């Protein structure tokens, strides 16, 4: 993320092809010289897969040699996307959430919801988790699984409002076209992470954005036109509630100390993620290094 904010990374806005069913296939190339490399990710987003045996996000990552351009590896990008997205949110919580944050709200019931709960446990002393989603049965199932695997009190609730009530951390990971995070749901001092993407709507309402200290991965990425940007920030700008300068900082600027983070215990902070390819490059480099060390994978001769 420091590469992104310093300009060392080469990372054009993603492009996508859409299909009539509402799905899309996006291309996300990047070069990240520090702890990354040269790669591109191809990722499909098909919200209609929710509740089926297929994930909503499916991806491949292709790694290239940054000196010669030679293809080096083809990796499962679905797992990489899940883990790097949750890791980015956890990094934002490490930098912005109150140190005493103990109650976590999970909005959504998919793979990102579970990954976010697991990631937040690594950076804050979470003691209680509340889960809400469109499907009550799936919320109950996720809460039960989190309680078993994480060893904390995890309960399903009926509404997003109930999940957010008195929460110190709110993680939104949905495909909702209408806000699941509303300002009136939130208590002072909460840290919100939002990774949901919907071309027809948004996950966080304008009032929350206007009141919050807003941090992103890349200002250029969030303000880019679809499919690269996000309605969560574009719409409040169009409504005249905020200016583009309301975006306080990029994560990389917090890491280097170029910008400060939370300034008071009661401040609401918001990390709006659109997912940037530099994160995929860094994650792919870690996976490829580990695979080589452990002798994993299959070698394919493309010239044969």
Task: Locate predicted features.
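Adenosine-phosphate binding glycine-rich loop
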Residues: 201-304
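N-terminal ligand-binding/catalytic initiation module
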Residues: 1-82, 90, 100, 249, ...
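N-terminal Rossmann-fold NAD(P) dinucleotide-binding loop
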Residues: 113-114
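Rossmann-like adenosine-cofactor binding region
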Residues: 152-241
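Conserved beta-strand elements of the Class I
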Residues: 104-105, 269
